[in-house]
Regions:
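Extracellular/periplasmic helix-loop-helix junction of adjacent transmembrane segments
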Residues: 28-56
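Helix-loop-helix hairpin linking two adjacent transmembrane segments in secondary transporters
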Residues: 96, 125-126, 130-179, 185, ...
Length: 402
């Protein structure tokens, strides 16, 4: 596989999760109606069930890939994803749909864990950074265009057409893997699965104040993101009577998150992870409090919501990758297991918090905005816990690096 094809392949792997979530959003009302859901908020389970499967499976794929190799484990994950998509196409009840979506998440988790592992196997240093940067640029476009893809499908086909698209996406990736991706993990580098070793690594992760603090802070802000994703379609349709603007505004908000991620990549080496992420957290918290005040005063409209939400997502993009990196700093010697545990906790915890926010949707933006503010305060508390009450400190790292 040549360099360009490899970059596109990694980008496609990274995009699997985002497209499986964001393309669903315009179809949630139709799915709820077709499967006889009695409460509109319950349609959000289409998102949450996927996230729970995605989060839970992250805990196992790293160890499996280190033991059995990248290619075979990736093939299994993509097969689960594709078969689950077929199950969703033919789902005749909401319960079957939830099971199919959870299995989709289980399959998609393989792409999330293995994308970085495969790049690490094949490249190192600047070349690895170049591959990840190029793939990340492609990946950032997916949340921007995925809702519009879903909207186009439901305009010209039944909502099940979205799952046909996801099935084809998974099948193409599976065939691509089978035909073009060799095994990237050398046999001598394979490691046996050790319960004792995994338990020891978990103990190291949970014993680190910095790791636990940033893991929980990341869970809080992920909860806000998932709450927004869960209820965004209903907010535009019911709170603002502007369903026709949903995909456009959602894309614009996603652009701000993409821009902040690109900005972070440019400045973090010079400014430092802590300065960037702590400033972003304070900005995020300030915006959430302003937004809560706007809603409480009764002057909320689609423009105030969209502008303030874009500001929050901009801050989000400056926080999350840095929170993850700082959580990993003390446990780099058990990076694989630590990364799996971080992904498990932040995704499962964030999905559950986001589900609670979404289920409290009452036709207004009040639950979401006050939830954002509460989660922002808790994220600050956890960061202060990690940093022993001090923000912007470098912990003795080289200047501009932390």
């Amino acid at each position: 596989m040549g360099f360009r094809q490899f970059v596109v392949f990694i980008a496609a792997m990274m995009a699997t999760n985002a497209i499986a979530i964001d393309s669903m959003l315009p179809a949630l009302p139709e799915i709820g109606h077709a499967l006889a859901i009695d409460t509109a908020n319950h349609a959000q389970w289409v998102i949450t069930a996927y996230l729970l499967g995605f989060g839970a499976a992250q805990i196992i794929y790293g160890s499996l890939a280190d033991r059995f190799g990248r290619r075979s484990v990736l093939m299994v994950g993509l097969a689960i994803y594709t078969l689950a998509s077929i199950g969703a196409i033919f789902a005749g009840s909401f319960e079957v749909m939830m099971a199919a979506r959870a299995l989709q998440g289980v399959g998609s988790a393989a792409t999330r864990i293995l994308a970085v592992a495969i790049v690490r196997d094949c490249y190192s240093g600047r070349q690895m950074a170049r591959v990840m940067s190029l793939a990340f640029i492609v990946f950032l476009s997916v949340p921007i265009i995925a809702p519009s893809i879903g909207q186009l499908i439901v305009l010209f086909a039944p909502w099940r057409g979205i799952f046909v698209m996801l099935c084809l996406f998974g099948a193409v990736l599976m065939v691509w893997t089978w035909l073009r991706l060799p095994e990237t993990l050398h046999p001598e580098d394979r490691t046996p699965i050790s319960v004792a070793g995994i338990s020891h690594a978990f103990g190291l992760v949970l014993g680190s104040r910095i790791t636990v603090g940033y893991m929980l802070a990341m869970t809080m802000v992920m909860g806000g993101l998932f709450g927004f994703i869960n209820s965004s379609q209903q907010i535009f349709a019911d709170a603002f009577d502007a369903a026709h603007l949903f995909t456009i505004v959602f894309a614009l908000i996603a652009v701000f998150m993409a821009l902040s991620s690109l900005l972070n990549a440019r400045i973090v080496g010079r400014v430092g992870m802590r300065r960037v992420s702590h400033a972003a957290l304070l900005g995020y918290l300030a915006i959430t409090l302003v937004h809560a005040g706007v809603v409480a005063s009764g002057v909320e409209n689609i423009w105030t919501f969209s502008i303030l939400q874009a500001g929050m997502m901009f801050c989000f993009g400056l926080m999350v990758s840095n929170f993850n990196s700082m959580a990993m700093e003390p446990v780099g010697h058990v990076a694989g297991t630590a990364s799996s545990l971080l992904g498990f906790v932040s995704t499962i915890g964030g999905a559950l918090l986001g589900f609670v926010l979404g289920q409290n949707f009452d036709g207004t933006t009040l639950p979401l905005t006050f939830g954002f503010a509460a989660f922002g305060v808790m994220a600050l508390v956890f960061v202060l816990f990690a940093e022993k009450g001090r923000l912007f400190s470098s912990h003795g790292a080289p200047a501009g690096r932390s």
